[in-house]
Amino acid sequence: NLFISANTDVHGATAHDHGRSGFDRPMTLIFAKEKTLESVREALEAKRTLAYGFGAVCGEEQLLKDFFTASMKVTVNRIGTQNVYLTVTNTSSITYVLKRGDSNQVKLAPFHSMQFSMPKTRETFDLTVLNMYSSKDGHPTVTLNY
């Protein structure tokens, strides 16, 4: 019944190695309400943490969904006769590996955008985030609104 955390087994200075391996160093993301020791402790006890490392984010499913949704900006480019054309922008520093329905997986790089078209009759669409884990094989599926 512990909070999720990320770490390494490196025994020494790692500052000069960041970026060389192609991955960011592991980090524990703590969602504290304030910048105080008490607030950090409360967040840890409430298990409001995510582990980030080697291109993956792990944690409780709802927190993963909220984190991903907060990282995305959805813009309607134009509305056609049958489809709505959207831009989804990743406003975070994390590359996301996404899958929509039966389509191929795609990578959405940090601070980059991709285009989607959706039937005009829908107001939401689902993306499964393949580099987020809520269990060994569990990836959250997030509903985005436009």
Where are these regions (language model features)?
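Charged catalytic cores and adjacent phosphate/nucleic-acid-binding surfaces used
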Residues: 1-146
